[in-house]
């Protein structure tokens, strides 16, 4: 790591508004479809944003997927209600829009396609013929916006109950409970809800049996210890063999994206911790970075290193729980108790720095809540001296155990092609041999200044490989923390910028203008310039991202939260068909997910 962070060469600010006309893919699209076929939107997302006609969608998607360096992953797909948006200068007329975020691993570049829709014609062709993982994203977009995807294999609700009325992310849908009638659960309504939860195989294209025997349909969850949360998987069984299965999510849905439209840019920060409740400050990182792009804020070097330090502490904390519970799922109980001892040491350190444990809500727009306290370095030093020996003991006692290896090697295995098709990120993707970690591929918060390695598998992602990669990731996080300890820069813990929220306290106590700004930003919220921004990070479970749209207000016009666990659970049927029920338990333990991350 660079010892003097202030000597770094100045880079182009991440928050510049750009149209990316110099990106090669824009030229490739214009050569194929003509120079006037698209509208290119200038944003602060950091990726080309191209509006295309609905009739061109599948053709453009197919073209991008077949380029010499193809766009092989559908990273995200969702919608937006454009009807109340006032700042749309130069954009096609639209009541609603759908966006498609594609990634090219070979180019290390993205592109975002947008389709404009009229309120009286909310139809767009399904993308599932090109990218199978579009299935759940299209279901969610229909569920929350009412946009129909023609040709979808089973367009039904996924987040809301099947009996729900309306589409919650529309602007005319109430955001507060007080705008609804009081909730009542009559016996008739309870019976209706229970009937809606009854699984009907025919609705999913499943047969109830063959000529010789019937299949069993079994509910695993939504209350089952191996489901790791409120999560149901309906299994179609031939004996103990899984013929097919249907993951059923949404039981933990809290309307996190809708809340983003009602909270100020500042007051939404505590909600980000709870998207994936084990990640703590890791979840705050993409949100505050995306807001800082909108605001045009470049934070001090000290802030970057503090943020990295807290993020890596929470990464270790999450990985320890994942590894120990995986071992427990396979059948060994003891390691999980030892891991909680280690995690307590991390919580003691986090609490000393932030004042909180699991959900600090400590990152701020333009910095962090306060400076590091006295003695933080001693606590971190003690943890760094403690953890490597403990990690070695886990590996020797449990992870190298022949029974565990035999139980997990070759189970739920898939290759690079399948991982990319299903939008898999994190250790699941890297286990297939693809070296893609956002901290290295697209550094943020100063990660480019740290010396660490990215563990990569040998070509097949199975349960054992995924776990062992996480073990090595733990070692690399310890390596990063060592550099944070030895090279913490001096300087302020907040940026000197009008939109830093709250403003630095020293000025608030001395200048009436800053005091007024503090009052307005905390009570009403800071006003962000009208624009769009995007930030992805390498979170604990894969790639997490925030796509924010500002209409020049104190609140976000649209907050899109893309989480890795949502994509990973959609892959379950493809990875587990033909396996045993006991293999499914091992597979679920190896994914590393929590349902809050799935359902938001």
Swiss-Prot record:
GO terms for molecular function: NAD binding; NADH dehydrogenase (ubiquinone) activity; NADH:ubiquinone reductase (non-electrogenic) activity; quinone binding. Its EC number is 7.1.1.-. It is a peripheral membrane protein. The keyword Cell membrane applies. It comes from the Bacteria. PROSITE patterns: COMPLEX1_30K, COMPLEX1_49K. The keyword Acetylation does not apply. Residues 1-190 are annotated as: NADH dehydrogenase I subunit C. Residues 214-600 are annotated as: NADH dehydrogenase I subunit D. Keywords: Cell inner membrane, Cell membrane, Membrane, Multifunctional enzyme, NAD, Quinone, Translocase, Transport, Ubiquinone. It is found in: Cell inner membrane. It catalyses: a quinone + NADH + 5 H(+)(in) = a quinol + NAD(+) + 4 H(+)(out). Pfam families: Complex1_30kDa (PF00329), Complex1_49kDa (PF00346). It is an enzyme of class 7 (translocase). SUPFAM superfamilies: HydB/Nqo4-like, Nqo5-like. GO terms for cellular component: NADH dehydrogenase complex; plasma membrane. NDH-1 is composed of 13 different subunits. Subunits NuoB, CD, E, F, and G constitute the peripheral sector of the complex. PANTHER family: NADH-QUINONE OXIDOREDUCTASE SUBUNIT C_D (PTHR11993:SF45), NADH-UBIQUINONE OXIDOREDUCTASE 49 KDA SUBUNIT (PTHR11993). NCBIfam families: NuoC_fam (TIGR01961), NuoD (TIGR01962), PRK06075.1 (NF004739), PRK11742.1 (NF008728). In the N-terminal section; belongs to the complex I 30 kDa subunit family. NDH-1 shuttles electrons from NADH, via FMN and iron-sulfur (Fe-S) centers, to quinones in the respiratory chain. The immediate electron acceptor for the enzyme in this species is believed to be ubiquinone. Couples the redox reaction to proton translocation (for every two electrons transferred, four hydrogen ions are translocated across the cytoplasmic membrane), and thus conserves the redox energy in a proton gradient. This is NADH-quinone oxidoreductase subunit C/D. It comes from Escherichia coli (strain K12 / DH10B).
């Amino acid at each position: 790591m660079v010892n003097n962070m202030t000597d770094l060469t100045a880079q182009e600010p991440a928050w510049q508004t750009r149209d990316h006309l110099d990106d090669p893919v824009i030229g490739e699209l214009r050569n194929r479809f003509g120079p006037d076929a698209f509208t290119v939107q200038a944003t602060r997302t950091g990726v080309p944003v191209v509006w295309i006609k609905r009739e061109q969608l599948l053709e453009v998607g197919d073209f991008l997927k077949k380029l010499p360096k193809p766009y092989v992953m559908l990273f995200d797909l969702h919608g937006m209600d454009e009807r109340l948006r006032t700042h749309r200068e130069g954009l096609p007329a639209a009541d609603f829009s759908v966006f498609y975020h594609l990634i090219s691993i070979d180019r290390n570049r993205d592109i975002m396609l947008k389709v404009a829709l009229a309120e009286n014609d909310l139809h767009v062709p399904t993308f599932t013929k090109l990218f199978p993982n579009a299935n759940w994203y299209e279901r969610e977009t229909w569920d929350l916006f009412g946009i129909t995807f023609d040709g979808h294999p089973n367009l039904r609700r996924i987040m809301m109950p099947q009996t729900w009325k309306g589409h919650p992310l529309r602007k005319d849908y109430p955001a507060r409970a007080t705008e609804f009638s009081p909730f009542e659960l009559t016996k008739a309504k309870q019976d209706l809800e229970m009937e809606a939860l009854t699984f009907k195989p025919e609705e999913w294209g499943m047969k109830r049996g063959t000529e010789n025997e019937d299949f069993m349909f079994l509910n695993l969850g939504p209350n089952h210890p191996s489901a790791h949360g409120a999560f149901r998987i309906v299994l179609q069984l031939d004996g103990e063999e899984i013929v097919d299965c249907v993951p059923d999510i949404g039981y933990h849905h809290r309307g996190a994206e809708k809340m983003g439209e009602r909270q100020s840019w500042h007051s939404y920060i505590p909600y980000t911790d709870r998207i994936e409740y084990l990640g703590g400050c890791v979840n705050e990182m993409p949100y505050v970075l995306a807001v800082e792009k909108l605001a045009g804020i470049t934070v001090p070097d000290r802030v970057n290193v503090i943020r990295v330090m807290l993020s890596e502490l929470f990464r270790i904390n999450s990985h320890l729980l994942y590894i120990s519970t995986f071992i427990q799922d396979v059948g060994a109980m003891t390691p999980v108790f030892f891991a909680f001892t280690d995690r307590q040491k991390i919580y003691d350190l986090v609490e000393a720095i932030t004042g909180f444990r699991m959900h600090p809500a400590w990152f701020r727009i333009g910095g962090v809540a306060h400076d590091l306290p006295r003695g933080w370095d001693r606590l971190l030093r003690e943890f760094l001296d403690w953890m490597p020996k403990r990690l070695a003991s886990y590996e020797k006692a449990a992870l190298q155990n022949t029974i565990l290896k035999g139980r997990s090697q070759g189970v739920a295995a898939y290759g690079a092609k399948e991982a990319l098709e299903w939008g898999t990120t994190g250790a699941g993707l890297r286990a297939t041999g693809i070296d893609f970690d956002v901290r290295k591929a697209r550094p943020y918060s100063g990660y480019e200044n740290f010396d660490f390695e990215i563990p990569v598998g040998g070509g097949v992602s199975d349960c054992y490989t995924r776990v062992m990669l996480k073990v090595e990731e733990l070692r690399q996080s310890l390596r990063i923390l060592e550099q944070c300890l030895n090279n913490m820069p001096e300087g302020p813990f907040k940026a000197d910028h009008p939109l830093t929220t709250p403003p630095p306290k020293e000025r608030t106590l001395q200048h009436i203008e800053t005091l007024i700004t503090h009052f307005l930003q905390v009570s009403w919220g800071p006003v962000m310039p009208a624009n769009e921004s995007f930030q992805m990070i390498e979170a604990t479970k894969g790639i997490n991202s925030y796509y924010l749209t500002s209409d020049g207000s104190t609140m976000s016009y649209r907050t899109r939260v893309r989480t890795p666990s949502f994509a990973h659970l959609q892959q379950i049927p493809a990875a587990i068909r033909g396996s045993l029920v006991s293999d499914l338990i091992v597979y679920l333990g190896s994914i590393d997910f929590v349902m809050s991350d799935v359902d938001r």
